[in-house]
Amino acid sequence: GIFLSPGAVAKLVGSKAAMIYLAAAAFAAVLAVTFAAASKYVVKSGAAYAYSKAAFGDEVGSYVGITRVVSASIAWGVLATGVVKTALSIFGKDSSDMKTVTIGFITLMVVLLIINLIGTKLLTIISNISTIGKIGALGITIIAGIFILVFSDGANLQDLTILKDADGKNIIPEFTTSVFVTALVGAFYAFTGFESVASGSADMEKPEKNLPRAIPLAIGIIACIYFGIVFVSMYIDPVAMVTSKEPVVLASVFKNQILQKIIIIGALMSMFGINVAASFLTPRVFEAMAQEKQVPEFFTKRTKGGLPLTSFILTAGIAV
């Protein structure tokens, strides 16, 4: 999300990074409104799968469902890797060692399985704590960044134009349509999640009433925060945004170690919360397909805590 994507976006578009996030927010808002409208009429689990099946029939629904399960599982795997690498960097371990990362990854999956087996109450508590940690870290960063900008001259964005790689070529490429689209996709990744919110709507209270309100509101709040954090970071130290090799690039912008720790811990809490959400929502897409008899029905079997265990194992396997 916002902790992992800014560096890649800044390397593509330089000083235009904050504007790219605004453009990505606009696209996300359009899709969010679409999902919000659909959630009024279809309250089954599965989100995009359930909506497309209701609108276009079984064949399209099946295609969207399978695509969604695979893509969501892969995204879950990427996010899980991010959590492991961030945790390793916090404890001073080598985050590039594949053996260590793999052990951490499998350990994380076991922890997520245990959390899901306990039930939705624990999931809700963890999600709320991670949200508070994420918003708190980003909010503190924005406020601190504004103070730094007010009481200092800030950085010169033109410094990005003179950055060269080992071959003497500009690190920031020429701004073209292709570069814009690539950067937009990278920034859009920070907004992903709203399309999964309705995946477990059958386990929510009054989804037809609450989801149409929650999805657009969440996108609006997130867009403001994300724009603020990228804007402030680019004006504090744009060179660090582009050249840093750290997993959490935003921490490299600040020289203050306390701020760095706040950002890294906030990133870890956020990414862990996203993994918890992914472990809850992703299996339920495949479960929804099983309920519609488009995949074997044994994927609908749940534990006493309400976990579709076979669907969880399948999606976790794809993530691994």
Predicted segments — roles?
Residues 3, 44, 67-82, 191, ...:
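Membrane-helix boundary/coupling elements in multi-pass transport proteins
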Residues 80-108, 152-180:
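Inter-helical loop and helix-membrane interface segments of multi-pass membrane transporters/permeases
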Residues 87, 100-158, 192, 215-220:
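Membrane-interface loop-to-helix entry segments
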Residues 4-99, 104, 218-221:
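Extracellular loop-to-transmembrane helix junctions
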Residues 1-5, 189, 318:
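The first (N-terminal) embedded transmembrane alpha-helix
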Residues 7-9, 49-55, 180-210, 214, ...:
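Helix-loop junctions at the membrane interface of multi-pass solute transporters
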Residues 50-51, 57, 89-94, 165, ...:
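TM-loop-TM module centered on a large, flexible mid-protein loop between adjacent transmembrane helices
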Residues 118-128, 194-225, 290-305:
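Hydrophobic, small-residue-rich membrane helices and short re-entrant helix-turn-helix hairpins
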